[in-house]
Structure formats: structure tokens, C-alpha cells
Swiss-Prot record:
Belongs to the TPS (TC 1.B.20) family. One of its GO terms (molecular function) is protein transmembrane transporter activity. Keywords: Cell outer membrane, Ion transport, Membrane, Porin, Protein transport, Signal, Transmembrane, Transmembrane beta strand, Transport. Likely functions in the release of soluble HxuA from the cell. The keyword Transport applies. PROSITE patterns: POTRA (PS51779). This is Heme/hemopexin transporter protein HuxB. One of its GO terms (cellular component) is pore complex. The lineage of its organism: Bacteria, Pseudomonadati, Pseudomonadota, Gammaproteobacteria, Pasteurellales.
């Protein structure tokens, strides 16, 4: 008799769980995996554009203006001498010399010849190369031209920053100082990579060296803004954990003098149903600007809305490490390579039905990303990555209640791609188009799925809508830039988004009649008012053009405000 009430309570709990499950089965219940994915969308960094041309020196001969056509003579041979008056091989100049040798030439023609030789070497990576027609007596039709390719002279450093002199020396030794000559691509790479170092501004200055044909390099480095912070509010959260979110963060550069950077980000939703903390520390580790970093992330959540009765809550811990290398740095092309490892511990509970799930995920990701000034006034961005993962899955659910495809251990592979283009148009207009997507080799756990909805997806649908194993997104946007106030810019835009995907890679366990594919699309308009380094206010509204998500809102209104210090 005393046992009956206890069994009655258990039976009631099971019954409650069944009823709740039936009522919400059509909805995607957020968990630690999907909520982490939503935050990863928020953490996407702005894309870096190539800088454009750094050095554009043309070889203007000092003789051209003073030489007239004048007396001509037959040119039989041209001797090219280096700065030590040693004759150099001229095979690479044959296509230039053939236009002069064996013909009647004047001093003006010889000046043009020297100019062409200078231009040839400058276009072939010798930044300050100069061909000079020295004073000489021309005998038997032989003319001597002095070729100064631009040898590396003295490299001096004026460092008024927290960046270590030793690091700057190592970086110069792998670029400009690695060659006998001042090579354009190496000098550009040095200038670009040192200006990529957070917390510093760098400038380069070339001057004539002490010896003939030498060029000295002066490196000037000053501190930029080493400490920065921000506070932001937005309504981009999940409706089951709180739409409104408050975030704050800080960043400190050059703590150890090796271009290191420490970043801390904190976020909480309204009523604190979602809390997240993330820390990232990285430092340059060699003279090739390779960066090593470590990350840690903590998330805690509790669901409301339709899932409140389930008493759903959970938390996750993520630890990671990465290597980032600037593989290619030129004025018009950037390519970076990144390898990262992450270890995740995910825990989810539905306390009303006594269900607890634990997952451990180890993943290794290798990828590239970059940008290219391929078209005038336009920049193309791209990225490719492959993730290899291992999942260990535990659940307290009885076997008869678990999904048919549940596996305690599994391996998976995920492929991601992104391609976008930004084109500046006349009259302060611009057009953006982009496509990104994901492929998988099997059905994925929620932390690896692609989210089609949200501000980074189809903007007419809420954050977290349509979580798919494989999917593709197309976004187009037409913008107009208008300077306002003293330093602010008002950007107005019209956009269209389209997304499609498969909820599950392997659909063999789905019941008949359950649709495994989804297509979303929306149109909208937005306004953005910002002052770089000070504040940004973004407002947009989007309307779905589909009816493929149950209980979807008729429109989405997105708002974010950020203040930087």
C-alpha cells in the first residue's frame, strides 16, 4: 500500500513526458549544441580586404628631357654592368635589346633603352632597380649601361611601441632581409604582415644607401590602440532562451611584445536564461607571423516558452587550440591557413521526465580563407574547411524511448564553403552577393548542424530555425552609403535571402510522410548608422516568402546597438 503513491508519481511523470513530447515534437528543441551554433554565427569576424597597391614606382630617366634626337650612330653591342662593373648575362633582356642593337640610335634612344631596362626589372620584382647610362666614350658601337638592381643596405628600426624589437628583426629576416636585393613582394609582405599585428601602426621608408646601388630601409613602429572594449544590446537571441541579449567584451594587445591578443566576451539574455562567456588568447610564435591561440567557452541555458514545462536546461564547456598562418600576403590577394582542435562537453536535461544527455565531441578542422581584388572596385571573399569529428553520446533514456539512429560512438566529417563578392558601384551604391553551405557524410549532432534562419541566414526567420545536416544559403544585398554628421555613415539596404537543406543526411529512420527537406526565402530592408571605432546602430525588417516552418512569425525585426571604447 505504501508503494502505490511512489509508482503513481513515476507513472505521472512518464505520462507528462509523453504528452509534452507529442505537443512539441514538431518544434526544434534548442539544446547546448544548437545554442552554441547560434553564438558562433554572432562571433563571425569581419572579412579583411586586401590593401591594394602599396608601391607603384615608375622609372623616369633623368636624361630624357635633356637629350634631343641629335647625332645617330650604329649600335653594335650593349654591355650590362653591375655595381661592381662586372658584366652580367643579358639573355632576359634580349627582347628589349633587339629593338636597338644593329640599328642607328641617338642618345635619346639610349636613354629610352635604359628606361625600358629599368621598367623590366621593376616589373619583375626589383622594386628600386635602375638602369643608368654613365658618361663614356662609345667605341666600335659598344655602349655600357650600369644596372643597379637595388641591394639591401642598412635596416634600421625606430620602435616606439610595445612590440618586441626581436620579433620585428625575425620578421624582417624572413622577408626583406632574406634576399640580396630589395624585392617588391618581400617588402610588401613585410609591410602587410607587420600591420596585421594588433596594437601597432607601422610605416616603411626607403632611402639611398652609403654604397652605390644600395637602398636603406627605415622601419617606424608606433603603438595603436592597445586596449578596447564594447557594450552591445540586440534582439537576435532564441525565443526560448530570450530574444534580448546584453553583451560586453574587452581586448588587450601586446602583453608579451610578440603581437599577442587577449579577448574576453560575456553575454546574457533577458532574465538570464542564456549565459555565455568566451576567452581567446593568441600570440605570434615565429618570424613568419604564424599565430598560436587557445580558446575556452562556457554556456548555460534554461528554456522557456513551449518547452518550459519540460524544465529543459543545460550547459557546455569548450576548450580549443589553433594555428593560423598568413600563407599569402600581397596587396591584392590574401590567403590564410588555419588548423584548430576543439573538445566539447555538452550536457542537456529535461528534468520533468528525468532525462539527461551527455555528449563529448573532439574535432579537428583544417581550412583556408582569403580575399581577392579580382575586379576593379570589387573584392571577392572565399573559404573552405573540413572538420573531422568524434562523438561520444550518453543518455539516461530507456532504450525503447531513444531514437533508432542513436549511437554511443560515431565519427563524422563536415565540409563547409563560402564565396561572396562585394562590388562598389557609382553614386555611392554597392552590391553584395554570397553563397555558403555545408556537406556532411552522415546525420549530425546539433552542434554541427547548419542554421538556415537568423541574421546570418534567411533573415525572415528567427534565429535557430531550420537546423540542417546539409544546406546552402544565397544572400543578395543592394546598398547605398551616405555620409552624415561629422564622421558617421548611413547605409540603407534592400536584401533577398534563399536557403535550402536536408534536416537529416540519413533519412532511413524517418517515418513515412515526414518531410526531410526545407526551403526558406525572405526579402527585407535595413538601415545602419555607424562611426568606425565609436558606435553602430543596425535595424532591419524581413518578411518570409515561404510557409515551411511551423508557427513561424509573419516577419522578423532585427535590432542591434554597439558602443566601443
Amino acid at each position: 500500500m505504501k508503494m502505490r503513491p511512489r509508482y503513481s508519481v513515476i507513472a505521472s511523470a512518464v505520462s507528462l513526458g509523453f504528452v509534452l513530447s507529442k505537443s512539441v515534437m514538431a518544434l526544434d528543441r534548442p539544446d547546448t549544441g544548437s545554442l552554441n551554433r547560434e553564438l558562433e554565427q554572432r562571433q563571425i569576424q569581419s572579412e579583411a580586404k586586401p590593401s591594394g597597391e602599396l608601391f607603384n614606382q615608375t622609372a623616369n630617366s633623368p636624361y630624357t628631357a635633356q637629350y634631343k634626337q641629335g647625332l645617330k650612330f650604329p649600335l653594335k653591342q650593349v654591355q650590362i654592368l653591375d655595381r661592381n662593373n662586372q658584366e652580367v648575362v643579358t639573355d632576359e633582356l634580349a627582347h628589349i635589346l633587339k629593338n636597338y642593337v644593329g640599328k642607328e640610335v641617338s642618345l635619346s634612344d639610349l636613354s629610352n633603352l635604359a628606361n625600358e631596362i629599368s621598367e623590366f626589372y621593376r616589373h619583375n620584382n626589383y622594386l628600386v632597380a635602375k638602369a643608368i647610362l654613365p658618361p663614356q666614350e662609345i667605341e666600335q658601337g659598344t655602349v655600357k649601361i650600369l644596372l643597379l638592381k637595388g641591394n639591401v643596405g642598412e635596416i634600421r628600426l625606430q620602435n616606439h611601441s610595445a612590440l618586441s624589437n626581436k620579433f620585428v628583426s625575425r620578421l624582417s629576416n624572413t622577408t626583406v632581409n632574406a634576399s640580396e636585393f630589395i624585392l617588391k613582394d618581400e617588402l610588401e609582405k613585410f609591410a602587410l604582415t607587420i600591420n596585421d599585428v594588433p596594437g601597432v601602426n607601422a610605416g616603411l621608408q626607403l632611402s639611398a644607401g652609403k654604397k652605390v646601388g644600395e637602398a636603406n630601409l627605415l622601419i617606424k613602429i608606433n603603438d595603436a590602440k592597445r586596449f578596447s572594449s564594447y557594450v552591445s544590446v540586440d534582439n537576435q537571441g532564441n525565443k526560448y532562451t530570450g530574444r534580448y541579449r546584453l553583451a560586453a567584451g574587452t581586448k588587450v594587445s601586446n602583453l608579451n611584445g610578440w603581437g599577442d591578443e587577449l579577448k574576453l566576451d560575456l553575454m546574457s539574455s533577458n532574465q538570464a536564461n542564456l549565459k555565455n562567456a568566451r576567452i581567446d588568447y593568441s600570440s605570434l610564435i615565429d618570424g613568419y607571423s604564424t599565430r598560436f591561440g587557445v580558446t575556452a567557452n562556457y554556456l548555460d541555458y534554461k528554456l522557456g516558452g513551449n518547452f518550459k514545462s519540460l524544465q529543459s536546461q543545460g550547459h557546455s564547456h569548450t576548450l580549443g587550440a589553433y594555428l593560423l598562418h598568413p600563407t599569402i600576403r600581397t596587396p591584392n590577394f590574401r590567403l590564410s591557413t588555419k588548423v584548430s582542435f576543439n573538445h566539447q562537453n555538452l550536457t542537456d536535461k529535461q528534468q520533468a521526465v528525468y532525462v539527461k544527455q551527455k555528449r563529448k565531441i573532439n574535432s579537428l578542422t583544417a581550412g583556408i580563407d582569403g580575399s581577392w581584388n579580382l575586379i576593379k572596385d570589387g573584392t571577392t571573399y572565399f573559404s573552405l574547411s573540413t572538420l573531422f569529428g568524434n562523438l561520444a553520446n550518453q543518455t539516461s533514456e530507456k532504450k525503447q524511448y531513444t531514437k533508432e539512429d542513436f549511437q554511443p560512438q560515431s565519427h563524422f566529417t563536415v565540409y563547409n564553403y563560402r564565396l561572396s563578392h562585394e562590388q562598389i558601384l557609382p553614386k555611392s551604391f554597392a552590391f553584395n552577393i554570397g553563397i555558403n553551405g555545408q556537406f556532411a557524410d552522415k546525420t549530425l549532432e546539433s552542434s554541427q548542424k547548419m542554421l538556415l534562419g537568423g541574421l546570418s541566414g534567411v533573415r525572415g526567420h528567427q534565429a535557430g530555425a531550420a537546423s540542417v545536416d546539409e544546406g546552402h544559403l544565397i544572400q543578395t544585398e543592394f546598398k547605398h552609403y551616405l555620409p552624415v554628421f561629422s564622421q558617421s555613415v548611413l547605409v540603407s539596404s534592400l536584401f533577398y535571402d534563399y536557403g535550402l537543406g536536408k534536416y537529416y543526411k540519413n533519412s532511413q529512420f524517418l517515418e513515412k510522410g515526414v518531410k526531410n527537406s526545407v526551403k526558406l526565402q525572405s526579402v527585407g530592408a535595413g538601415l545602419s548608422l555607424s562611426d568606425a571605432g565609436s558606435y553602430a546602430i543596425n535595424v532591419s525588417v524581413a518578411k518570409p516568402l515561404d510557409n515551411n516552418i511551423n508557427n513561424a512569425d509573419k516577419h522578423q525585426f532585427w535590432l542591434s546597438m554597439i558602443k566601443t571604447f
